[in-house]
Structure formats: C-alpha cells, structure tokens
Amino acid sequence: MTKLRHIIPLLFLALSLACAAQTLDTDALAEYPAAIQRQVFEVAQYAKLTGEQQRTLAEAIKKENKIFADAVKANGGALIVKSRNKLNKSREATLASILDREQLEQYYRGVYDAEADAEGNRVADMLQKKYNLTDQNWKFIRVAFYKAALESKVIRKVMADSPKKAEKRIAEVRAEQMRSIEEKGGLRVNPDMTITWLREFDPNKLHR
C-alpha cells in the first residue's frame, strides 16, 4: 500500500501529460481514412502537433503504407526483417523532419514510458529484497532509475546522429539521478548494483 502511494502521483503526472497531447485535428485530417487518422493519433497522443503537422504526417504515412503493402506483396504476404527495419527507419526520419526537438522528446517519452517504468520497478524491487530497504528508499531508487532509463532512451533517439554526444549526455543524466538517491536516501547505488550506505535516512533532508 505504501509503494502504491508513491506510484500514484507519478501515474497522475503521466496521465496529465498524455491528456495534454491527445488532440487530433479532425478537420485537417477529414480527407484521410480512419486507418491513417489512427496512425497520426499514435503520434499526437504523446506530442501536441499542429493541424499542418498532422496533415504532413498523414501524407508521409500514406506513402509508408504503400511501401508496406508492396513489400508484403513481394514476399508472399510476409514482412521480412529487412523491410521492417527499412520502414522503421523511414518512420523515424519522417518524425524527425516534421516534429521539432521538444515534440520529438515528448513523443519518445510517451513511447518508452512503460518500458522505463518497468526498469525502475525492477531495480528498486531487486535492491529492496537484497538490502531490506525502507519504502522511502525504494521510492527514491525507483524514480531515479525510471527517469534515467526514460531519458536514456529518448536521448538515443533524438541524438541518433551524434552517438558520442548522446552517450555523454546519458552519463550526465544517470549521474544526476544517482546523486538524487544519495541526497534523499543517504545511500549510493554502485554500477554493479550493490549499495553503499552513506548516512542514516533523514526525512527532514527532503524539505531542504
């Protein structure tokens, strides 16, 4: 129950961000079939797009769907790995050409949120079981690893053309999140997933 109280605020935050972006311009997309509108919504549910952006995306999806249909037909009804990878790269390039940096980050945060959430819970549960951590420290670890995992995935996508810079930024984000655990919980999570205790947990430190 205590863990649930820690998770609920994050769920409301994620829900509020998602609701803020879930806007489909039905007038701008009126000429497109429902299947294409749905594919546009799969992007617009995470990143708020203008009507013009949605139309541009719809046109790109229309072309992608034609490529998809041709690829499946050419391979006897199957989509081979090479064609799938080509389509995925095409979609990523399309999004990068239509969305600005902030929109791309919003989109990929939405895409990878559940995966990052699972990673945060996995690490926190593992360390709590191993070290008999308090629920407060479970929360600090869970949030830090969730944020680190989420931002790492987003950075690798939006900085795909600069992998060295991306990895440097990821290292900075991870270090920042690990420091948050130390500052709030008085413990350090080491790279080998062991814990070093720095001080006793002080709830008053949370309010400084």
State each model region's role.
Residues 1-27:
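Bacterial Sec-dependent N-terminal signal peptides
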